[in-house]
Amino acid sequence: QRRLGDIETAMATMTFAGRFSEGGGSNVSQRLNLAVWQTGILQPRQALETANGIGDNLSPYGEAVQQWVRFAAYRQLGDLARAEQAKAWLQAHDDVAAGYFMEALLEDNALDAAAAHLIGRLQSTQHRSDTLLSVQRFVTVPSLPGDAERDRRWWQVVARRDVQAALNAVGRSDAYAIVARGSSR
């Protein structure tokens, strides 16, 4: 539905999907995805309500998504102290946060730090494959309003000379006429 440009219907579907049980319990993954989308459409209060309603018994990755939602939502609400707490958690757990610390750096417009972080991930044998995939250009859906500036900054960081030098040392970045799995990047 999002690929068809119908954000409202997509949100309604995600809300409905979040009501189903998952493995006998709360449908955590769908509810976290909904909370991320709520930050993307600039609904920070709803995003916090959704994310906090899940509870704290999450996988490490689930907790990372929850902390990302808190960071983004508190930033949108102007509560920078709470946003910084969530960002500190993302930084401390970057190995399991699957790029959410990078997203926080981009949201903060900390482009030098984002470039250094990206270079570090390119140089890491543990993170290189996922990082190389992240710098490829695919056919994507348009960015949600809350994601657009961060997405623009991402490509600005990828285009930097220092990042390109690190990238070219271990791989390459190219554009492909293949539809991406779901992200706006």
In which residue ranges do the predicted regions lie?
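Solenoid-like repeat scaffolds
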Residues: 15-25, 52-61, 85-96, 119-130, ...
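"A position-specific structural signal for the A-helix of alpha-solenoid helical repeats
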Residues: 32-33, 67-69, 76, 99-100, ...
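Long, ordered, amphipathic alpha-helical scaffolds
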Residues: 98-185
